[in-house]
Structure formats: C-alpha cells, structure tokens
Amino acid sequence: MLKEFREFAMKGNVVDLAVGVIIGAAFGAIVTSLVGDVIMPLIGAVTGGLDFSNYFTPLSKAVTATNLADAKKQGAVLAWGSFLTLTINFIIIAFVLFLVIRAINTLKRKEEAAPAAPPKPSAEVELLTEIRDLLKKS
C-alpha cells in the first residue's frame, strides 16, 4: 500500500499541483503586499489620505473606537474597508491569472498551428533515390 501511495504521489499531476499551490501562495503574498503597500496608499493619497483598511461601520452602539482593531474588541463591526482591500486583491489575482492562462493558450495554439516536419523517407526510398541519381549521372 505504501508503494502504491508513493507511485500516486510521484505522478506528474500531483507534483505539478503541489508546485502550483506553493507558487500560488507565494504569488498571493506578493499581490497582498502590492495591494496593501502600493495600490491602496495611492488610492488613499488621491482621495485625501484615506486608509481604507480602517473603514468600518459599527453594528452596536457600544463601539466608540476610531480604528478597526479597537472597534472589533468593543463589539460587532462591518469591516467594509478590509473587504474592499481584499476585493481589489482578488481582482488583481484573477486578472494576472487570466493573462497567464491566455499566454499559455496562445503558445499552445502556435504549437498546434506549426506544420509538422515531413517524415524522413524510409531506407527503401533512400536507396531508390540513390539508384535514380546514379542512373542520371551515367
């Protein structure tokens, strides 16, 4: 049973999937940083220095805090600023994934469209060609 599992785990699809998950996690961290550290501050600068990650709507009168972390400690809040940031994050990841898949599909189509090389003539055909060429010379 262990041998069977090892064979299953070493199949190309399983290994490819594992590599894809690891690369996807790393890419997700990069996009999260891009959104949180680059895009959202730029949007905040354009909109007058707003920090969307701290935008929330209190769902309880007990919530009097002005930042999200303290507000969550005081009671229920609707953290729509965090949701907005994560939505932008998702859109960027989905768009980049679309571009990658589109590029892969374009490459596949080019490979399929490329004409196949003509098959090498058989030994008999090569021999007959040589005989013909010799007869032409004489």
UniProtKB/Swiss-Prot annotation:
Belongs to the MscL family. InterPro entries: Mechanosensitive_channel_CS (IPR019823), MS_channel (IPR001185), MSC/AndL (IPR037673), MscL_channel (IPR036019). Homopentamer. Keywords: Cell inner membrane, Cell membrane, Ion channel, Ion transport, Membrane, Transmembrane, Transmembrane helix, Transport. It is a multi-pass membrane protein. One of its GO terms (molecular function) is mechanosensitive monoatomic ion channel activity. GO terms for biological process: monoatomic ion transport. The lineage of its organism: Bacteria, Pseudomonadati, Pseudomonadota, Alphaproteobacteria, Hyphomicrobiales. The chain crosses the membrane at residues 19-39, 81-101. It comes from the Bacteria. Channel that opens in response to stretch forces in the membrane lipid bilayer. May participate in the regulation of osmotic pressure changes within the cell. SUPFAM superfamilies: Gated mechanosensitive channel. It comes from Bradyrhizobium diazoefficiens (strain JCM 10833 / BCRC 13528 / IAM 13628 / NBRC 14792 / USDA 110). This is Large-conductance mechanosensitive channel. It is found in: Cell inner membrane. One of its GO terms (cellular component) is plasma membrane. The gene is mscL. PROSITE patterns: MSCL. The keyword Repeat does not apply. The keyword Secreted does not apply. Coiled coil: none annotated.
